[in-house]
Amino acid sequence: MKVATPEPVNLGSVSRIAYFGPRGTFTEQAARALAPGEELIPVETVRQALTTVREGGADAACVPIENSVEGVVPATLDALSESTALVAVAEAILPIHFSVLTRHGGGEIRTVASHPHALAQVREWLEANLPGAHPVASSSTSAAAVGVLDGEFDAAVCAPVAAEHYDLEVLATEVADVGDAATRFLLVRPPGELPEPTGADRTSVVAAAVNRTGTLAELLTALADRGINLTRLDARPTRSNFGEYRFFIDFEGHVAEPRILDALTALRRHCRNLRFLGSHPRADGIRSTVEAGAGNDDFVEAAVWADAVRKGELA
C-alpha cells in the first residue's frame, strides 16, 4: 500500500505546517505528502500543533485522526472540539509498519518505547521476538528514538524514516501485527475558502446533542433520510457533566451539495452546538454513494417546487 492523497488542493496562503513531531514521525511523512515543499514545524503534541495554528504560529497543522487497527486518536478529536474552530482541507492515508531501533552495540533489551498506538500495533511481535522487554509509552515514536539515544530506553518502535534522522541501529524492519494497517491524517487550518467538491469528498462535524432519549437516532436519521452514507461515528465525553458526550460524525459528500447542506441544517436543529470540521477530498478517492431520489438534482427540484407552492404558482 502506498501513501494515498487526493489530487492536490489549493492550499491558498498555507506555507507553514505545524505537525506532531519530532522529526521522523509518520505525521511528518503525511505533512510532506500533503504540502510538499512547505516549511514544517515540529511540535511535541497534537494539541500543541493545533494551538500553534490558532495562535498564528503556523498556517495549518497536520495531525493523525484514525488508525485502521487502534481506531480514532482521542487527543485529536478532543483538541478539534475545543477552543476556536479549525477545518480540515485535505487528508492523507499512510501504510503503517515499523522499525525497531537500538543503540549501536546496545546489549540486552529490557525496555521498548513508543507511542501507545504504535505499541498496540506491534504487541504480538514484541511478545514473540522480545519477550523479556518491558513496553514503555512515549509521547511519539520519534520521541522514543530520542530516548534511546539518551540512554533512557533500550529500543524504540518507530516509523522507518526515523532511522534516517537518528544515529541508531535497525534491529528489525517491516514490523506490524496487521500487515495492511493504515493511518489517516488531516491537514487543518482556520475557516476560509473550502476545497471544491470532487464527487469523492468527506464532511465532518462534531455535535453536542441534547441529552435525552433518541437524540443520537435523530442525528443519524437526519443523514439517512437524505441518503447520506456515514463513514465514521465516535463519542467523546464533554468533560463537564458525567454522561454527556460529543459525537464526531464523518459522512460522504461536500457542503457545497444541496443534500449535504440540508442535512447540516437538520443536524443543527437537533444540537445544542454543531461545529463544522470541514469538507475535503477523500484520500482513497471513493466516490459518494447516492441513492435514488437523494441526488443533488432531486433536492434542487424539490426546493424549486416548494418555492413555487409558497408563491401560489402551483395548486
Go through each PLM region and give its residues.
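Domain-level signature for soluble enzymes in the chorismate/prephenate branch of the shikimate pathway
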Residues: 1-315
